Amino acid sequence: HPARFAKYMANHGFGDSVTITELLKRNGYRTGHFGKWHIGPDSKPGTYGIDVINNNGAAEKDDKSTRGRDAHLMDGAIAFLKQTARKKQPFYLNVWGHITHFPVKPLPTYAGRFAKVQVDESKFGPEMKTKFAQCRELGGDVTTGMRHYLADVYSMDLGIGRLLKAVDDLGLRENTIIVFSSDHGPAPVVLANEKNKAPDRIEFARNMLGTPGPFRGGKHTQWEGGVRVPFIIRWPGKVPANQVNTTSVISFMDWLPTLCKLTDTKNTAVNL
């Protein structure tokens, strides 16, 4: 298994394994990827059957001072949607943003919306109380960190809203499945120790204030706080709005076969 000898897919890619983007491309879909890559060293167009790839971290940094650090990704994704709509071609699109990943440094205009927020630690469970204590131990300020984290989430909401509006304005709403999810639970404060020099440690410490809710653990753990993530679907006429399913158990291993079935895409049992 790759985890036994540190040959992680983030660094080495998928090898000969078949990906959902390759299968959908064979079925006539236009494919795009905007944002974090973490699936191997090669990211030129055509990799894994992806037609358009933008994983430019430099653009993300340059754009932070004006509209938020993922604005350029949304720009690219919306342009992809417009081009695809003109071609009247089915599509598959990944938008893997950076927002809420440390370091969290939101725009002042966003942070200002949460300037009156005060953290009442009594309202949080043991997991978050431990985080708060670790944050203070490293010199971070809990209230400032929470304000920044909320501002980053707000920035993400704005970006997703732009993307949804583009889908609707292009007349794609009724025939587009949109899924919002995450790769893992919130990061632990202990990651701040990887930054040896102040003020980096302080800055990172107060970045780690995402909550796993009632669950234990987070990123880098196999507890529910690490592996139980949101999975929100918008599919008009198929998935009822404003309903929560708390009984079904799903995994991202279900992603490929489910999409293949929904799109009448031929699947293969080789190298999956």
Map each language-model feature to its residues:
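Short active-site alpha-helical segment characteristic of glycosyltransferases
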Residues: 20, 36, 255
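Active-site-proximal cap/lid insertion segments
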Residues: 1, 37-44, 52-253, 260-271
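Active-site segment of extracytoplasmic enzymes that catalyze sulfate/phosphate-ester chemistry
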Residues: 1-19, 23-32, 42-59, 229
